[in-house]
A protein has these predicted regions:
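Non-catalytic substrate/cofactor recognition surfaces at enzyme active-site rims
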Residues: 1-314
């Protein structure tokens, strides 16, 4: 194993693994170490199982366009949302059985709302269930089988479904209850149709299967007033050069799998930084010139290009 690259879906219905909300050293609150240990064990077993199951594969790639209506809302100006869902279907070269489907799209998994107290991956769960097992009834399709993996794309700025109603595949509108299921299944239908079209036309077969990657550890400076929170023990550990040149450690990965390019981003990346349209409007979170140009996807060279948010962090 040369590189393990991972990312959080950023679901709002799970224990805090970053310590942004749960770690308050000043009042004696720290991580849920039992949950952290459980998560670490599951990561290790997932990696070892994947390595033990390595097999030659063929790959079909596609990209679904995600409509704004019934899918996305941007809660801060400028109104720019992620409308690209890059997809890859990896199949066993000998048996033609699905090994895994890979998808990435930018949306906060928070459809259950702030009062939901159970652990869930939100709409991601319903997306993965549909991709693996299919759907019955209206807009039905046979699932791909194998494993479905979903990575959160650019969600900063902020991509949410809380401000909209979502109509499910049966025509029923959901304002709260059922919204996450509707969104996950609607998204899976788009993914299925995009991959099916590429398979029928035989245009999505990935000829080049080589793998390459680059990984870089960086230290990001922390300014005031966040330094005050550090001094008071209100922020999780993992900080360097205290107290005057406070920095936080993180990592960025660039990965190529054949004609698929992936970059990871720590934290939440604004869609306009990835796809274009960057501005610096009044009331912006950070007052600065819009210097993030050209957008990152224009710099990437894959036939499909993915940006995994909360990558190598959270």
């Amino acid at each position: 194993i040369d590189l393990i690259s991972f990312a959080s879906t950023h679901t709002h219905s799970a224990p805090d693994t970053l310590g942004l909300w749960s770690y308050k050293e000043l009042i004696g609150r720290k991580f849920d170490h039992e949950y952290m240990t459980f998560m670490e064990e599951r990561i290790i077993s997932s990696v070892t199982d994947a390595v033990d199951s390595l097999t030659p594969a063929k790959t079909i790639i596609a990209e679904a366009k995600v409509p704004i209506e019934n899918f996305s809302f941007d809660s801060r100006p400028p109104f720019i949302v992620d409308q690209k869902m890059p997809l890859a279907l990896f199949k066993n070269l000998k048996t033609d059985e699905t090994i895994v489907t890979l998808a990435s799209w930018g949306m906060h998994p928070e459809g259950f709302g702030p009062k939901f107290t159970k652990i869930s991956s939100d709409f991601v769960h319903y997306f993965r269930e549909a991709m693996e097992g299919g759907l019955d009834g209206k807009s039905d399709f046979k699932g791909f089988g194998g494993k479905s993996i979903f990575f959160t794309g650019p969600v900063g700025g902020l991509m949410t479904q809380l401000n909209i109603d979502i109509t499910d595949r049966f025509g029923v509108k959901h304002g709260h209850e059922g919204k996450s299921k509707a969104q996950g299944e609607n998204l899976a239908i788009l993914a299925y149709e995009a991959l099916r079209e590429q398979r029928v036309k035989e245009q999505g077969n990935m000829d080049f299967q080589g793998i390459a990657f680059s990984a870089k550890t960086i230290y990001l400076p922390i300014g005031w007033p966040l330094k005050a929170a550090v001094a008071l023990g209100l922020v999780h550990p993992g900080l360097y050069e205290l107290p005057f040149k406070t920095k936080v450690k993180t990592e960025i990965n660039a990965i190529r799998i054949g004609e698929i390019e992936i970059i990871t981003s720590p934290g939440e990346m604004f869609p306009e930084i990835i796809d274009g349209g960057i501005e610096s409007p009044l009331g912006a979170d950070i007052k600065t010139d819009p210097i993030e140009i050209p957008p990152l996807r224009k710099l990437m060279k894959g036939k499909i290009n993915m940006n995994f948010n909360l990558g190598m962090d959270e």
